[in-house]
Swiss-Prot record:
Disulfide bonds: none annotated. One of its GO terms (cellular component) is piccolo histone acetyltransferase complex. Residues 372-395, 484-508, 603-624, 646-669 are annotated as: Disordered. The keyword Cytoplasm does not apply. Belongs to the enhancer of polycomb family. Keywords: Chromatin regulator, DNA damage, DNA repair, Nucleus, Transcription, Transcription regulation. One of its GO terms (biological process) is DNA repair. It holds the Pfam family EPL1. This is Enhancer of polycomb homolog 2. May play a role in transcription or DNA repair. It is found in: Nucleus. It comes from Xenopus laevis (African clawed frog). Residues 611-624, 654-669 have a biased composition (Polar residues). InterPro entries: Enhancer_polycomb (IPR024943), Enhancer_polycomb-like_N (IPR019542), Enhancer_polycomb_C (IPR009607).
Amino acid sequence: MSKLSFRARALDATKPLPIFRGNDMPDLNDCVSINRAVPQMPTGMEKEEESEHHLQRAISAQQVFREKKECMVIPVPEAESNVHYYSRLYKGEFKQPKQFIHITPFNLDYEQPDYDMDSEDETLLNRLNRKMEIKPLQFEIMIDRLEKASSNQLVSLQEAKLLLNEDDYLIKSVYDYWVRKRKNCRGPCLIPQVKQEKRDGSTNNDPYVAFRRRTEKMQTRKNRKNDEASYEKMLKLRREFSRAITILEMIKRREKTKRELLHLTLEVVEKRYNLGDFGGEILNEIKIPKADKEIYAIPPSLHNGNHHKVPECKVKNTHHLNVKDEVLEIVRLKKKYPKKPKADILVTPLPQANSEPLAVINRSDIKQYDFQSSDDDEFPQVPSPLSELEEENDPDGSYAFRRRAGCQYYAPHLDQMNDTPETTDLSGLARHRNRHCLTTLTVPRRCIGFARKRLGRGGRVIMDRLSTEHDSVLKQIDPEMLSGFSSSSHIAQPPSSPSRTNASDRHCENRLSLPEILSNIKSCRLQCFQPRLLHTQDSDREECTSRLGQAVNLKRVSSSLLNTSKNGITVTGGITEEQFQTHQQQLVQMQKQQLAQLQQKQQSQQSLQQSHPKAQGSGSSDCMSKTLDSASALFAASAVVNSPAPVRSEVNKDQNAGHSNLNGVVQPSGTAKTLYSTNMALSSSPGISTVQLVRTVGHPTTNHLIPTLCTSNPQTLTMGNSCLANTVHLNNVSVVSPVNVHLNTRTSAPSPTALKLATVAASMDRVPKVTPSSAMSSIARENHEPERLGLNGITDTTVAMEVT
């Protein structure tokens, strides 16, 4: 505290001054209450420091004795100096350093440890150096790591091995020494540390208040006495005023919005009055919301390989409401186009994600008096109900077809559409085209299983494969074995009615075993497709391609007649390979004779027609009876017996000559044709000598033949519940093939006419001549009727022949 003092003021003449005599001088204690006394100034110390005992005693002694007493001072510890002890610790070899402040360079030097060795550590280090070399710095680093890793609890030996990258013996020796020294040490740590107080000033360990740590306080202006509490109050008041200003601005904006809404409502009423919309029809038309696109949770997979670039669609919460701005004007409604029904039933739409579309509120859905007023600020406003979305659920999603403005669209061609087998309104060739059959490829030569052919964009041929349980076995089948089956099959005719379903097809393709599938191929109940090869072997065949077709068909007829039956029917007798080769040579020689006669008599053909006018009318009908000689008739009569194994190799040779076929028929486009049972009438002109080959069916429970004969008169051949179809005319040979024959009744015995075939054929001793006109008519007839040529295959029937 400072002593009492007076402030110098100007004397006032109006106020009397007190006059004291020397003996009447008042004491010091009486002068304390004088009003002119200057208030005590702050000493610059805290209250605790001012009340400290030594400080108060020193101040009081100075005031009383008017001088400084040596005994009345703050005690300070004396500094003792022992020169001898100092000289013993620090030698007199001191050198003045060049600089006292050292700056650590910015390098990767290892940090020096905080632990310093003592004499006890040197003793241990000397003992360890006898067995291994260890430096003092290395020892200090080890002790320093152990000290810093331990707090109140010491680290274990295993943890010390992880901290110290040294030898196990050295680590164990240093660890044991460190633990023993740590326990003997009175302090908490072996490394001396400077005592540090807390920064908040809460430590009161120092007895002298003057040396305690000060707390950081906020500096305020002393003249206005703004302490920390008043400053905080001012900050709070500022925040409250800022909040009030923000609320006032929001209220101002709300009132402006309500005023604009009122003006817009008045404009809408005026416009409706001018348009005459007193019933609200135009207003309701405008209020119809626009259709929003659906939000899909899973992005559609792109087939261009850039799957890593597809952004993920985030699923939004359904409780959020988006207000969509919509102009309140007359909007033209979007024209809806009718969607065509999809014919493909196999293609099922992908399941949509379980994400509901986001709720959207349009401006037009809000009623004209749905705005808030100033009275109901505390109550939340409930929006008007949402309008119904009239958009249809399109299964195509974002890939749905949408017409663009300025584009002209044409109707699709119905003849180029690829229909699926499941369509019920298909009939004829359209249904036949979708049939799957066993397919063989040429390059590479292998079987790919069940497939169907269709024409793709740009004329490319596309094979649609059908997965079955026999794919692994069918791919291992030798294509040469299927070539023998397909070469003997006949033409598949379209069905008479579209009532036939695919149940039998799926049964034949998916539910049958492999032996049954091969049996169905041989019995013409299942198809086998092979691509056609268009290449010839020599130049002679390129000149007479149409003639070669006739010879090839004759060869296929002869090879089909030699096939055996698989239903247990055996017939005595047979032919050898030499006879078959002889018959083939005779057919080739016959064709060469016909070609030679055509070239020789080409110039004299007109004169022959004038000299024989009657022969022209009957030339086309007489050609059927003048094409077989006696040797060929005998060979055809013996064709009812089983054929040996080498015959199949001959058939394969004919196929490899450049005419691969589908079930024995050369198809122009390679499309497989289904097999159907239809009723066909076998007719021939009366009075014409014909040789007809008729297939007879062998019942699996009988051991005799059931021939079906074809006479010269028109008639319909029926047998049981099936009909004979596919009559093929090869000059004078007619082949009738049964399709899907099922015998439900007991068959009859063979007719006597069939038993006379051999004797009648042997009685033909003369060889009829072949006229050019008859040959030309027969060749022309075959060229114009390629689809009627059918061949017998490896079936469960035998063949009989009648010569009339």
